[in-house]
């Protein structure tokens, strides 16, 4: 494997795993709360986008990036509505 491909595949593997964990958890949570399928799917996709960058976000915040998988599951469990409301409250936009 070339020297260019190996780091790229490592990044994609890690981000893909985190995104998949957030997606699955969000989809399970939404279906458990009996939300309709398309709303559940959209919520899960948005959580997957956040979960995919959990590793970099933890590094940016100065935290240990080894917990990015746990952070991705937490993102999926909380959902984008709750995370968005929390961010609005923290920034004073609510």
Swiss-Prot record:
InterPro entries documented for this protein: Phage_lambda_GpS_holin (IPR006481)
Entry-linked Pfam families: Phage_holin_3_1 (PF05106)
Transmembrane segments: none
GO biological process: killing of cells of another organism
Origin: domain of life: Viruses
Keyword set includes Lipoprotein: no
Keywords of the record: Cytolysis, Host cell lysis by virus, Viral release from host cell
Family label: Belongs to the lambda phage S protein family.
Biological function: Essential for lysis of the bacterial cell wall by disrupting the cell membrane, thereby giving hydrolytic enzymes access to the cell wall.
The protein's name in its UniProt record: Putative lysis protein S
Organism encoding this protein: Acyrthosiphon pisum secondary endosymbiont phage 1 (Bacteriophage APSE-1)
Lineage, opening ranks: Viruses, Duplodnaviria, Heunggongvirae, Uroviricota, Caudoviricetes
């Amino acid at each position: 494997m070339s020297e260019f491909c190996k780091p790229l595949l490592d990044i994609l593997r890690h981000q893909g795993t985190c995104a998949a964990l957030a997606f699955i958890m969000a989809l399970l949570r939404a279906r458990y709360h009996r939300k309709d399928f398309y709303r559940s799917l959209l919520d899960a996709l948005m959580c997957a986008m956040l979960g995919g960058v959990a590793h970099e976000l933890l590094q940016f915040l100065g935290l240990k990036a080894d917990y990015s998988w746990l952070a991705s599951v937490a993102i999926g469990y909380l959902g984008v509505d709750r995370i968005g409301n929390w961010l609005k409250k923290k920034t004073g936009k609510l």
